[in-house]
From Swiss-Prot:
EC number: 7.6.2.-
Pfam families xref list: ABC_tran, FtsX, MacB_PCD
Keyword Ion transport among UniProt keywords: no
Cross-referenced PANTHER family: MACROLIDE EXPORT ATP-BINDING_PERMEASE PROTEIN MACB, MEMBRANE COMPONENT OF TRANSPORTER-RELATED
Function per UniProt: Part of the tripartite efflux system MacAB-TolC. MacB is a non-canonical ABC transporter that contains transmembrane domains (TMD), which form a pore in the inner membrane, and an ATP-binding domain (NBD), which is responsible for energy generation. Confers resistance against macrolides.
Gene name as annotated: macB
Residue positions binding ATP: 53-60
Source superkingdom: Bacteria
GO terms for biological process, alphabetical: response to antibiotic
Protein name, UniProt field: Macrolide export ATP-binding/permease protein MacB
InterPro entries the UniProt entry points to: AAA+_ATPase (IPR003593), ABC3_permease_C (IPR003838), ABC_transporter-like_ATP-bd (IPR003439), ABC_transporter-like_CS (IPR017871), MacB-like_ATP-bd (IPR017911), MacB_PCD (IPR025857), Macrolide_Exporter_MacB (IPR050250), P-loop_NTPase (IPR027417)
Organism: Psychrobacter cryohalolentis (strain ATCC BAA-1226 / DSM 17306 / VKM B-2378 / K5)
Keyword Transmembrane on entry: yes
Length: 665
């Protein structure tokens, strides 16, 4: 029902508020206590009513029901002809927001915001335009003599001034019906008289005033007095001298109402502002709450970054096997019973057949042996590898000095050798450039024509053992006397799928040999294995780090539950001025999300600091590489933690009973 419809009902002879047979009971353990007994009363538009009674008489309970803060156990209560008995909480909030204004004995102002912002709170929930909201709040405060106090917080105001702010707040959305609970109870006599006069003036302007008091002198100021005792109305009479005004207050909220979306954004900003104020008011507690999130996010991001760095380092070392290579090795697959009878199956011709394929860039045959190598008076065991002219290309090795093998080296079976850095240090520790020096390999001399760059951590040769390379034809004929090779490495075109090339080479070799007396190793499969293994390890360690996040989330939930308890009175005030359950839930959920997002950002910053430290201290051994995916995931994760672990406290806040919330300090 719109404001216009409600006013139309009020303009007729129908009562503004009507109570019939109202009963209110409360549970006290296993007992049921009846506070109000068969209450019947009618209040018309523009009346000034005083409900008087001693403490425990039920007058405040009746006021709470009349103000839609509470609902009757039985009976009927109508406002503007509309029954409120079966209205849900948000529908009751709408009535409070658009038609009721509350003046409390203890003022119930929000301590962290200014007088202007306190007065504006009801209009935020009503969807009033921001500029109009501020202008009206300032005008109301000015009309009540507080023009110079609009920016003051409640702690900077006297009791009388705080009560005036409370009155201005009650009028913010129009305040058709003003409910005043002991409005002068906490004031000195002068301030009390001023407040009573303000209420009379408001009544003269057409506002319906309902005061709850135990003071007969205050009740005597009203047009009508309702006496209540032990939950029963014992008297209902009028003061004959009181002149009832005929005017009606204009509806304020309909003139400046925003769109539904604009109103939602306003409420969102209000929730955001209040969340920041709450966080600022408890800085240390907020920081400690964030700590679990900070550590968890930093751990996850650092572990993922370290895993990524390790993976990249390992994969870069695979370049020693070639960028995209397939190695064919002599012998039946492991576990095949034929393996023990025939292991000499690969020939240089097999390597050449593979080299002739269009998807193969180059091939290097290979065979290996361990032999004694001597240079002058230095003799050591070394690994000897016979390789093809394209070995440097397929292996990814690079020369530090000298040259590699060429076609003539293979055809003429030259006794040229290439040594690695270990052999250089072992046999020529004092010779910077050993090119041209001669080593004795067994009984065969070999002339050094090249030295390889150090390849620490690579996969092709031992880190410590000296390794010498010579043309495979030289090794076959001069060192081991064999017509067979142990393996060959094929460098595959990067535009070709390595799995397709592997299948094609397998088919070719099977066709040539008539059987599968060979084994194939794909460097890409090694890469995939390393990637999957690294990912699994990263996931495992991240799972442990995520436990910290969960603990941090539980910490957020605990602190938010404490915050809800501490701010119960604030929640009650917001509900009294018309906040929906969703508004309350939104406010506390935003606070939890803000704590987690801020904790997540600090955690990401800490992870960057840890990564920088590791990169500086670890050198080439450890590298932390951050990806945008992990950072975005961490940010999203911290947000989700705020939503998940902030939901329960936010829901508890939204489900609070307004009357119970207002009664707590």
């Amino acid at each position: 029902m719109s404001s216009q419809d409600l006013y139309a009902n009020a303009a007729t002879d129908k009562p503004l508020m009507q109570v019939k047979g109202l009963i209110r009971e409360f549970k006290a353990g296993e007992q049921t206590i009846r506070v109000l007994h068969d209450i019947n009363l009618t209040i018309h538009q523009g009346e000034m009513v005083a409900i008087i009674g001693q403490s425990g008489s039920g007058k405040s309970t009746l006021m709470n029901i009349l103000g839609c803060l509470d609902q009757a156990t039985a009976g009927d209560y109508q406002v503007f002809g509309q029954s409120v008995n079966r209205l849900v909480p948000d529908e009751l909030a709408k009535l409070r927001r658009e038609h009721f204004g509350f003046i409390f004995q203890r003022y119930h102002l929000l301590g962290d915001i200014s007088a202007r912002d306190n007065v504006s709170v009801p209009a935020v929930y009503a969807g009033m335009d921001g500029q109009a909201r501020n202008e009206r709040a300032e005008k109301l405060l000015s009309d009540l003599g507080l023009a110079d106090k609009v920016n003051n917080r409640p702690s900077q105001l006297s009791g009388g001034q705080q009560q005036r702010v409370s009155i201005a707040r009650a009028l913010m959305n129009g305040g058709d019906i003003i409910l005043a609970d002991e409005p002068t109870g906490a004031l000195d006599s002068k301030s009390g008289k001023d407040v009573v006069q303000i209420l009379k003036d408001l009544n003269a302007q057409g506002h319906t005033i309902i005061m709850v008091t135990h003071d007969p002198s205050l009740a005597a100021q009203a047009e009508r007095v309702i006496e209540i005792k032990d939950g029963y109305i014992i008297a209902d009479y009028k003061n004959e001298d009181y002149q009832r005004p005929a005017a009606q207050p204009a509806s304020i909220i309909d003139k400046h109402r925003k769109s539904a979306f604009g109103s939602f954004i306003d409420r969102l900003l209000e929730s955001f502002k209040m969340s920041l104020l709450a966080m600022r008011a408890h800085k240390m507690r907020t920081l400690l709450t964030m700590l679990g999130i900070i550590i968890g996010i930093a751990s996850v991001v650092s572990v993922v970054g370290l895993g990524k760095g390790s993976q990249e380092q390992i994969l870069s070392n695979i370049s020693s096997l070639g960028t995209n290579t397939i190695t064919v090795t002599d012998g039946y697959p492991y576990g095949d019973p034929r393996r023990q009878y025939n292991d000499d199956n690969l020939t240089p011709q097999d390597a050449q057949a593979v080299a002739d394929q269009p998807y193969v860039l180059s091939v290097s045959p290979q065979l290996n042996s361990n032999m004694s190598v001597r240079y002058r008076n230095v003799q050591e065991a070394a690994s000897i590898s016979g390789v093809g002219k394209d070995y440097l290309d397929v292996s990814g090795e690079t020369l530090a000095m000298g040259q590699g093998f060429d076609e003539q080296s293979i055809l003429r079976r030259t006794q040229d050798i290439i040594i690695d850095s270990n052999a250089h240090k072992t046999f020529f520790p004092t010779i910077a450039n050993p090119i041209g020096e001669v080593l004795l390999i067994g009984s065969v001399p070999g002339r050094v024509i090249g030295v390889l760059e150090p390849n620490e951590g690579g996969f092709s040769r031992s880190v410590d053992t000296p390794t010498l390379y010579m043309p495979y034809t030289t090794m076959m004929s001069r060192l081991i006397g064999s017509a067979y090779i142990e393996s060959f490495i094929a460098l595959i075109d990067n535009n070709i799928s390595s799995s397709a090339a592997e299948s094609a080479i397998s088919d070719l070799m099977t066709s040539r040999h008539g059987t599968d007396d060979f084994r194939i190793r794909n460097s890409d499969s090694i890469r995939q294995t390393i990637e999957s293994t690294t990912a699994a390890l990263t996931l495992l360690i991240s799972s442990i780090a995520i436990i910290s996040l969960i603990v941090g989330g539980i910490g957020v939930m605990n602190i938010m539950l404490v915050s809800v308890t501490e701010r119960t009175n604030e929640i009650g005030v917001r509900m009294a001025v018309g906040a929906r359950q969703s508004d309350i839930m939104q406010q506390f959920l935003i606070e939890a999300i803000l704590v987690c997002i801020l904790g997540g950002l600090l955690g990401i910053g800490l992870a960057f600091a840890i990564g920088e430290l590791i990169n500086r201290v670890g050198g080439d051994s450890f590298k932390v590489i951050y990806s945008s995916t992990s950072i975005i995931a961490a940010f999203v994760c911290s947000t989700l933690i705020g939503v998940v672990f902030g939901f329960l406290p936010a829901r508890n806040a939204a489900k609070l009973d307004p009357v119970e919330a207002l009664s707590r300090d």
